[in-house]
Amino acid sequence: MEKRIKLGLFGFGCVGQGLYDVLSHSEGLKADIEKICVKDRNKKRKIDAKYFTYDKEDILGRKNLDVIVELIDTSEAAFEIVTRAMNNGVSVVTANKKMLAENFEELFHLQEKNNVALIYEGSAGGSIPIIRNLEEYYDNELLSSIRGLLNGSCNYILTRMELENMDYNKALKMAQEQGFAESDPWLDVAGYDTLYKLILLTVHSFGLILKPEQVLALGIQNISFDDITYAKEKGYRIKLIATAHKVGNKFRVYAMPHFVSKESDLYSVLYENNGVEVEGAYSCKQTFVGKGAGSHPTGSAVLSDISALTYQYKYAYKKLKKLREQHNGNFDAGTLLDTDFEIKVYIRFANKEALKGIEIVSVEEEFKSSKTNYIIASVKFKSLFSLKGNRDSKLFVCAV
């Protein structure tokens, strides 16, 4: 008789409930959730209260669990849960991209030290199995670039604005009502969610463990309908794109809005869908598309990770280990980043003073009116870091 695996689950929010639903209807995976640890004692939940606990030790202290599944919001608490589980010899499935991106080096070493697996497909591309593909299908491929739409909330907002002539605030509210965006949407709209996911994909694409502070992230929080209109007139759609591509022996890695042309596969990826383009020396370009937000799509990715652990699946990290061998062990992956280049951008601004800090090399086009001002210009890429995480800036910057 096939053994049923026992799960300990942290978190029963959007993704946790999605996992519960898809697991309940799964005909292949034999698994039982033993306990679910949550914070709010007063919140109404759709399953029997006997499954819930408010003490993390009720899960971390159990000896009979096969897998711990971490699906909570806060990265600090998630890190404690994941590291304790691995140090106890228990494999972990997580969808917490912020926790992973901020602590990847230590988490990588803990997997090796304790001979356990940390699986996180649901943290990077929603329902798209992009990490598994990078680990297996592309493990020996010489990749030149990976780029994609990694945030379903932002793509939903941008699609609503363009196709339905909706303003940003209304589109954001609808994304929140649909459960695609959080009540505090900053991490989504400011590009940080995309940044964290990009860091994970860069590990599996090129073997680089980057830190969030080393990578540029600009978001859509300042977008206006004027920007959408300008893009449409030029035959583009605005998309928040994560990019990592190799240039010589270095890598350009960043996340920011882009004008995307009709020739790109990503042009037709709409609403809460994600899309990822992978380009290699031999496989050429391939595009993956799937749901990037929502309870059940991410829950299904988590379920797939749990299933993989039943046959002792682990990430091999071939490219990471190979790169480290080439550099005789540990090294700062930031030294392989190229930030010294020019990038062509569209910048909408209220006044010239707002452009202070951006090193403009040349201006190709300029428009001024009482309603809006914008320029198309080549700028020093490195200078755009002055805008990262700046809640006071009203500039909208988009790669052309």
Give the positions of each predicted feature.
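ADP-ribose/adenylate-binding Rossmann-like module
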Residues: 67-74, 85-103
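Rossmann-fold NAD(P)-binding glycine/threonine-rich loop
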Residues: 79-84, 97-134
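Substrate-binding/catalytic subdomain of NAD(P)-dependent oxidoreductase enzymes
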Residues: 172-268, 273-275
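Glycine-rich adenosine-cofactor-binding loop
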Residues: 6-21
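Short acidic low-complexity segments
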Residues: 51-62
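A conserved regulatory-domain signal marking ACT and ACT-like small-molecule sensing domains
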Residues: 306, 312-400
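Conserved anion/nucleotide-ligand pocket segment
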Residues: 136-202
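NAD(P)-binding Rossmann-fold cofactor-contacting core
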Residues: 26-46
